Structure formats: structure tokens, C-alpha cells
């Protein structure tokens, strides 16, 4: 793993402290930046997440993904599901399902509780499956 340092120019290009490049796949990068705006997730009329402190995770071969601090997510109707996945660039993922008045929305949210060492620290952040929410960002 190599960490590169990148400096932007001007007020619209924040300084990126670290861009992770993986030795086992040269050219593959993962990095985060602060989200440029307030982020919200709604399911039906329920506000599930609302933050001004979100992150955008950029990863080679993927679209950018918004991550929300866990403290800004309403966990009261979320339940840990049985689904887990593994990403060689970020680590093992656990998923959460949302209990609603009409049933469950399965695996609506994911979390990397212990990201691999090379990954930016997203252990206190969660992501959402955009196709399963009614309104976002």
C-alpha cells in the first residue's frame, strides 16, 4: 500500500491528506473528502439520516458514495441483518434492515465496523442503498 499526498489549487479544491493506492492492484485508489452539502435520507415520511458532516468516498471503478456519521442516523428501527460481504479494499461489511409499518426494507444500510488498515477510517460511518430509499441528498 502506498499513500500519496495531493494538493489542490484554489478554494474549490480542498487538500486531500491521503489517497490510498494498493500494492496488489497498482492504480486502484480509495479516498474520502468532506461532503460539499448537507445530506439527508428519507424512507416514506421518516427521516432516517440528516448530517452536515458526511463524507464522499471515491474508489476506482465505482461512482462516489456518500457516507453518514452513525451519530446522525436514526437507529431506532434499524436491525442488523444476516448479510455480510467482503471488499478487498475496505474490509468486511455488515448490513442493516429497516423495520417499517408494512414490513422490512432489507439491507438498506451498510457499515464497515473495522475497515482494513489501508482504507480511510470509515468505521464510524454508514452508507445507504440509494435504490431502497425514497429521498436522498
Enumerate the language-model features and the residues they cover:
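Terminal leader/tail segments of proteins
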Residues: 1-137
Amino acid at each position: 500500500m502506498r499513500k500519496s499526498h495531493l494538493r489542490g489549487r484554489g478554494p474549490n479544491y480542498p487538500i486531500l491528506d491521503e489517497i490510498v493506492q494498493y500494492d496488489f492492484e497498482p492504480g486502484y485508489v480509495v479516498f474520502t473528502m468532506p461532503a460539499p452539502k448537507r445530506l439527508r435520507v428519507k424512507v416514506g415520511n421518516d427521516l432516517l439520516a440528516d448530517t452536515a458532516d458526511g463524507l464522499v468516498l471515491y474508489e476506482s471503478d465505482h461512482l462516489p458514495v456518500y457516507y453518514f456519521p452513525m451519530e446522525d442516523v436514526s437507529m431506532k428501527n434499524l436491525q442488523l441483518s444476516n448479510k455480510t460481504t467482503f471488499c478487498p479494499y475496505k474490509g468486511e461489511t455488515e448490513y442493516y434492515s429497516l423495520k417499517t409499518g408494512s414490513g422490512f426494507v432489507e439491507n438498506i444500510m451498510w457499515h464497515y465496523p473495522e475497515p482494513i488498515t489501508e482504507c480511510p477510517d470509515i468505521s464510524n460511518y454508514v452508507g445507504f442503498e440509494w435504490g431502497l430509499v425514497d429521498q436522498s441528498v
